[in-house]
């Protein structure tokens, strides 16, 4: 594990912002590191406002999309809302279909079967639309590369509106409208929206056309916040505003489906991390284990008792998903060892009976042990399909592009992607991918990194600091929970390991003459010897509040621990 202290901004910038906000220098440092350099920046950051959302008509083709939907309503056409089977796709379909149904009855939804149809727009879905009299399909979280599919639909006189956030290819599909802030010819001010976020901009534009206010659309933000959390997009700009108000909806008046999911886990107040680890996996489990339609049913259900029934079924899917995840991860580790591939620059594994719904999770698990770009393949029909996950700084999408001659199709982002290939090309691809990674990955990318925001003393940890850090929420990419470093720390004699395998570490630490403070380090049990014999050591940690028997105290959430000589 390597520790990297983020570059410190100039002293002039720090002093100027610290004085303007009446905060300590290191708090000003945290803000500048997040792009907050002026009083107005800080005001917008700490006080998100719906007024900060951009005009949806700034997005390329938004006027065309709205005009086509309004024409469909005027002509009593049937509209099919189509989306991917993951959290971003199912929340987007739920959002757009629910909004349209509140104005117009001829709306239906379609989620492709993960195993029968695969990712994105499918020919089977277009045939379904044709057979059932749909003349307009709104595709969410997919479609930006579906050139052949859109052409096929056009032959059947079916129009497409694409709402996507993935990188476009060199050629765009021949759709009526393509809403994607990553289009090169799109001047929309913010290009980090998720698929559900693009869907929200569509209903915002439709609402604006109908003289609805942005406040009228707030009830839909529980869906948007869930998608933002699940899709791991930056929590900056519009995403911060949408996530901030979406969390308020989740914690005050969520839709029955989300309320039922929260009810399952019996947690009173959820933050963005809870959405990532509690709500998102359960919504995802429907598409992974059964069918994404189950998630849409849950998220669009108005009756709470019925929603509870749906949530109970999804809870079972999630339990099944965990069992599969555990088994396949174990088998993948065995394969790496048997093939003596521990020292490779990439991980590429395959087994034909691995469940396609969990291979992305398994890829992430493998990276925790073998920190390198990872692809997990399984059999899908007569082809092999994989999920890819990457390590910080390495663009797995570009690596796949470099090996495209061996692939049938691929798509995704810098850190996560999916692909299919012919069985006979698997070994050729595996070696080509290894060669590409070996030649392009930087040495430091092969070691997990802890990015430290600032070095502080325990005396800096005050109630005021805790209050300020709470206002940094919601956390996420480009606004991660601040990580601090403190040196010359000693344990007060209470160090112990926790857990059945003694894998966790519990400390009560001091620095010089400071008051003692509790610290917990998950997975750090093996480092307990560093804390013994009155040794001084260094901690990397984030700050949290621990509530016990009605008392609230500050606790260090340890990221790592190392000797003071480093």
Show where each model-derived region lies.
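Mid-to-C-terminal polyanion-binding domains and interfaces
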Residues: 71-75, 306-310, 318-350, 402-566
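Short alpha-helices
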Residues: 95, 171-212, 217-229
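Hydrophobic helix-and-loop "lid/oligomerization" segment in the mid-to-C-terminal part
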Residues: 2, 6-136, 156-157, 207-426, ...
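Alpha-helical scaffold elements adjacent to nucleotide-binding pockets in ATP/GTP-utilizing enzyme cores
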Residues: 125, 149-152, 198-202, 242-245, ...
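Conserved beta-strand segments of alpha/beta enzyme cores
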Residues: 106-108, 159, 177, 518
């Amino acid at each position: 594990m390597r520790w990297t202290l983020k570059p410190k901004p100039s002293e002039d910038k720090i002093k100027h912002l610290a004085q303007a906000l009446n905060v300590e220098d290191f708090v000003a440092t945290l803000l500048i590191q997040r792009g907050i350099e002026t009083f107005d920046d800080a005001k917008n950051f700490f006080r998100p406002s719906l007024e900060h959302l951009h005009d949806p008509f700034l997005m390329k083709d938004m006027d065309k999309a709205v005009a086509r939907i309004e024409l469909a309503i005027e002509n009593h056409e049937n509209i099919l809302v189509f989306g991917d089977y993951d959290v971003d796709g199912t929340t987007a379909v739920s959002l757009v279909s629910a909004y349209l149904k509140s104005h117009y009855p001829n709306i239906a939804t379609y989620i492709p079967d993960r195993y029968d149809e695969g990712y994105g727009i499918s020919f089977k879905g277009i045939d379904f639309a044709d057979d059932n009299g749909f003349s307009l399909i709104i595709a969410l979280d997919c479609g930006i590369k579906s050139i052949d599919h859109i052409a096929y639909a056009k032959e059947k006189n079916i129009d497409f509106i694409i709402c996507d956030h993935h990188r476009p290819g060199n050629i765009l599909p021949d759709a009526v409208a393509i809403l994607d802030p990553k289009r090169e010819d799109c001047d929309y001010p913010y290009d980090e929206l998720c698929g559900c976020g693009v869907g929200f901009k569509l209903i915002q534009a439709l609402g604006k056309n109908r003289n609805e206010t942005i406040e009228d659309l707030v009830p839909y933000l529980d869906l948007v916040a869930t998608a933002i959390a699940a899709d791991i997009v930056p929590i900056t700009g519009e995403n911060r505003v949408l996530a901030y108000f979406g969390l308020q909806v989740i914690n005050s008046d969520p839709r029955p489906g989300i309320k039922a999911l929260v009810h399952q886990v019996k947690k009173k107040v959820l933050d963005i991390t809870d959405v990532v680890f509690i709500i998102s996996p359960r919504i995802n489990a429907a598409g992974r284990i059964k069918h994404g339609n189950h998630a849409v049913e849950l998220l669009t259900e108005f009756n709470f008792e019925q929603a509870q029934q749906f949530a109970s079924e999804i809870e079972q899917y999630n339990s099944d998903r965990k069992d599969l995840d555990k088994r396949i991860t174990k088998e993948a580790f065995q394969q790496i060892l048997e093939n003596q591939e521990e020292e490779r620059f990439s991980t590429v594994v395959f087994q034909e009976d691995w469940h396609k719904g969990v291979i992305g999770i398994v890829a992430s698990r493998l990276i925790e042990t073998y920190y390198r770009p990872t692809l997990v393949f399984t059999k899908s029909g007569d082809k092999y399909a994989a999920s890819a996950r990457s390590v910080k700084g390495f663009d797995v999408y570009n690596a796949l592009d470099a090996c495209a001659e061996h692939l049938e199709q691929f798509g995704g982002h810098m850190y996560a992607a999916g692909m299919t290939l012919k069985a006979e090309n698997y070994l050729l691809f595996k070696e080509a991918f290894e060669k590409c990674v070996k030649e392009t990955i930087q040495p430091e990318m092969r070691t997990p990194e802890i990015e430290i925001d600032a070095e502080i003393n325990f005396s800096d940890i005050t109630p005021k600091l805790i209050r300020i850090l709470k206002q940094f929420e919601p956390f996420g990419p480009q606004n991660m929970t601040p990580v601090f470093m403190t040196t010359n720390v000693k344990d007060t004699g209470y160090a112990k390991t926790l857990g059945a395998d003694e894998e966790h570490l519990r400390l009560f630490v001091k620095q010089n003459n400071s008051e003692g403070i509790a610290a917990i380090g998950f997975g750090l049990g093996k480092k307990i010897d560093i804390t013994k014999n009155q040794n001084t050591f260094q901690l990397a940690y984030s700050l949290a509040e621990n509530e016990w028997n009605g008392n609230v105290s500050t606790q260090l959430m340890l990221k790592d621990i190392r000797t003071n000589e480093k």
